[in-house]
Amino acid sequence: MSAAVWRRRWGCQSLSVEDLLEAFRSRLAVPWRSEEAAAGRVWMLWYDKALERRVRGRLGEFRLAAEQSGKGWHEFDLAPEFGKWVARQTWFERAAEKPSRLGTVLPDFEAHLIADIKARLSECCPNDIFALTGVASLFGFLRASSLISSIADAVPGRLLVTFPGTHQGGIYRLLDARDGWSYLAVPIPSDAIV
């Protein structure tokens, strides 16, 4: 989406990775409350989908910013997970011959993914950031909203979701999809910054 279209549609400028890093650093400067509700422990780093590769390529800078502010960092990339999970299944060879049947196993994959992420979150401390990347790879398979809602209660510190899409008035749209969802996560950048 061009910057002009972005401005017209969402009333703001398309941000650079440097802008996102600055917004992330600003969020890190806010003291964490231990009694924060689950939704408040979820940070949505949202950006134009055209920036996905740049954000992923510079994730190390976000990690460095977190570590410089005294926070721990854990990272999990969702992008390869469906392929790895399907390849381990006993029915993989049959599914390869009839890929149209893969839709029937998506609830099993979602349950597996939720359990895997929760197990990884259990290794985190209340001062850690768990960065969940590759959310765009779920598009068409699973709903990001369902996944995030299912794991939010297990987050001891903060969950940073890299989110290629849009945010306006509490509504998030992954990859500019028509249907968005209302979620009380902390947007980075915040509405006030943009």
Go through the PLM ranges and name each one.
Residues 1-11:
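Charged, amphipathic alpha-helical linker segments immediately N-terminal to NTP-binding catalytic cores
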Residues 9-89:
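N-terminal, charge-rich interaction modules
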Residues 28-32, 112-123:
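Short, charged beta->alpha transition segments
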Residues 40-44, 129, 158-160:
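Residue-level preference for the first positions of well-ordered beta-strands
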Residues 124-141:
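Conserved P-loop NTPase "ATPase switch" module shared by AAA+ and STAND
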Residues 143-194:
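Glycine-rich, aromatic-bearing surface loops/beta-hairpins
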